Amino acid sequence: MARKDDLYQLLKPVVEGMGCDFWGMDYIAQGKRSLLRIYIDKESGVLVDDCEKVSRQISAILDVEDPIKGEYTLEVSSPGWDRPLFNVEQYKAYIGSIIEVRLQAPFNGRRKFKGLLAAVENDEIVLQVDAEEFIFPVETIDKANVVPQY
């Protein structure tokens, strides 16, 4: 597979050219058939029609450029209520929210943390979990999602 950065550089202009924000992407290897999930967003909200149009455009680009070797499924989606967080700017936008974080490697014997995103300083997040405060560099986070509050 192409590097994630290469895919990002290839696909971001396509998504933005269609009036959407490129929120992020996941590439999940699943045996013989992998999954490429692209998240798009819009201020007015993402409709199924938006996902369909962006999917067709991205599919055409991927067919021509062929950056992914082997079979894969392309999925285009809105980030949803439990939106994943991919970069520092997105973390900053959700300061004060409850988030779930899964680290690439264990910290204090665990990889999963859920707490209040208290701050973002430089490229690190400050997460308050009960009475404890943890500081994690964004680069050490494997996956993070906003926890919807109803």
Swiss-Prot record:
TM segment ranges: none
Matches recorded under Gene3D superfamilies: Ribosome maturation factor RimP, C-terminal domain, RimP-like superfamily, N-terminal
Species the sequence originates in: Hahella chejuensis (strain KCTC 2396)
Gene Ontology annotations for the cellular component aspect, listed alphabetically: cytosol
HAMAP family linked: RimP
Family annotation (CDD domains): YlxS_C
Keywords: Cytoplasm, Ribosome biogenesis
Compartments in which it is found: Cytoplasm
Domain of life assignment: Bacteria
BP GO annotations: ribosomal small subunit assembly; translation
Family according to the record: Belongs to the RimP family.
Chief location of this protein within or outside the cell: cytoplasm
Biological function: Required for maturation of 30S ribosomal subunits.
Gene name tied to this protein: rimP
Name this protein carries in UniProt: Ribosome maturation factor RimP
